[in-house]
Amino acid sequence: MKTDIHPKYAPVVFRDLASGATFLTRSTVSSSKTIVWEDGNEYAVIDVEISSESHPFYTGKQRIMDSAGRVEKFNSRYAGFGTKK
């Protein structure tokens, strides 16, 4: 097996910017920013805009769009389109 071909796999903190939640996990991603975790150790921190803590699919706060009104509006706007005069 070849040595030194695998990326560095280390503990990393992911911080959700939308909810402020933080997750400690292992990853190959690195960052120059660091944070002190609850255990007192310092880890690299990666800021993410959305995670399972703030995504509507996982939080159950999904909005269902009313597409029926949009279809009717489209049909009324283009009802006579393509007919010869």
From Swiss-Prot:
It comes from Clavibacter sepedonicus. InterPro entries: Ribosomal_bL28/bL31-like_sf, Ribosomal_bL31, Ribosomal_bL31_B, Ribosomal_bL31_sf. Part of the 50S ribosomal subunit. One of its GO terms (biological process) is translation. This is Large ribosomal subunit protein bL31B. PROSITE patterns: RIBOSOMAL_L31. One of its GO terms (cellular component) is ribonucleoprotein complex. Belongs to the bacterial ribosomal protein bL31 family. Type B subfamily. The keyword Glycosyltransferase does not apply. The gene is rpmE2. NCBIfam families: L31 (TIGR00105), PRK01678.1 (NF002462).
